[in-house]
Structures are given as C-alpha cells and as structure tokens.
Amino acid sequence: RIVMDRAVEVVSEKIQKKEKFLIPLANPRTLEQLVGFSLLLRDKKDKDSLVALNVINDDNDSLKQELQGKHSLERAAQIMTEADVEPKTVMRFDLNIATGIFHTAKEHDVTDIVIGLHHRKSIVDSFLGTLSENLLKKTCMQVMIARFHIPVTSLQCIIVAVPPKAEFECGFVKWISHLCRMSKHLDCQIHFYAHPQTSGYIRKYIRKKHRDINAVYTDLVSWEDLLILTGQMNYECLLVIVSARRGAISYDSSFEKLPGQISRYFNNNSVVLLFPEQNGEQQ
C-alpha cells in the first residue's frame, strides 16, 4: 500500500505538467457541448489549453467540408474567447481522419482528447465508431467520448462508475482531477461508485487535492452491478463510465458489454466514456 500511495503521489506531480485538450469537431450540432465540456475540465490558470480541430477527408467533397469546418472552428474560437481562453484552431486535410487527429495531437503536445460519440448509421456500425476505436489503438493519452442531451452548464450532478484496479493506471489521478474541476465549476455533487479499495484511493486523493468539492462515495463491489446506476440517474445527471483499453491493468472482459448497456439502459442520459491515460509509446 505504501508503494501504491507513492505511485499516486508521483502521478499527482506529473499532472502539474502543461495540459492540452484536443477537441476534434465533426458535427456542428455537438460543437458547443464538446467545447463547453472541455472548458469545465481544464485548469482555469491555463489560458491556452484548448485546441479545436477539424480534419477534412481529402477523398470526398472537400470544398463543402472546408466551408463547414471553417464555420465550426470560428464558432469554437468564439466560445473560447468568451470564456477568456486563447483560441487555437487547426484545419487539416487528410485521407484518414484518425491519422489527422493523431498527428495534430503530436504536433501540439496534446495530453487529452475530447471527442463526440458518433451517430450510428446502421445496426452493423459499432457503438464507438471506427474513428474512436482507431484513436484508442493509436494513442496512450486520455480519451473522453462524450454525448450530451442537455447543455453541460445545466448538469446538476456527476455520477462516476469506476472499475476495480483503476488506481493502478497511470492516468488515475488525472481523470479524478478533471472531474473534480468540473464538479467545482458547476457547483454540483460528484458521486463515485467504486470497489472499496479503489474508492479509498479516490477519497485520499480528493481529501488532499480537492477537499472543497462535494464528493459522495458508494461501494460498487462488482462491475457486474453497474446497472444499479439506472435507478440513480435522471435527465440532469452526467454518467461518466471509466473504462480501459485492452491489455490495461483494470481492463475487464465485461467492458465489451458497455456499448449495449449504454444503448439500452442509459440512452436518454448524458454519458462520457472515459479511457484513462496509459503507459506506453504512441504508435
């Protein structure tokens, strides 16, 4: 336990390094929500921590895409400016959208990616979509895949489902800090559902670094009990599900059920699927 506590302290120190959030914008209808969400996650002291990106597929009607992308980036810049954040926007042409996002992330020293949950075009289409799946394979950084049904500023509570062994991931305290910032900005309660051991580390870190937030803890002994959260959710709550990439310490085969569970039981809720930062080299 002493070794684990020291590991959390080391990662806590690393989070003090410059953060940069990349926001790939593909759908004008979700633009304001994604930028608004990213604004809530950032450290307010950092005035240049957001990068809005539009990747244009060179293989299709690029002129139409370019006009739409330009409009989206202008709107994103406006939202950032209104929040007293230095607007940084990038338009990129690439045959592969995921590759375009990946290279932009490397060029701008990005630490986190915030992306919208794609709209399924057919029943054979995957829940996350090819783009998100490729990003998770190509990068080790934290990726947040978000879907909002109401404006982010209207959220009244944040419910976080945390899998067992999440404390062993190198991105553990990073996502806790991000969600605590969001809770503080919104002045709303954040409720963690986690295994007792994992919950202990969350409590300790929050007491040390974010003692001013309203945090509540409930034991979630088995990840199979995730569906009990359906009784805790309402339209004004955000559900954050902490997942993990294949091969990660906290990865569990039951994560494969998450797409179906979200679609069936949380379809009317605002949801963020969070993949913590991992150790390793970017591809």
What are these regions (language model features)?
Residues 246-247, 258:
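Membrane-embedded transmembrane helical bundles of large multi-pass transporters/channels
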Residues 13-232, 240-241, 247, 275:
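Structured cytosolic domains appended to multi-pass membrane proteins
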Residues 223, 258-264:
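Intrinsically disordered terminal tails
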Residues 2-17:
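N-terminal signal-anchor transmembrane helix
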Residues 262-283:
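Short, flexible loop segments at boundaries between secondary-structure elements
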Residues 249-251:
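C-terminal structured domain segments
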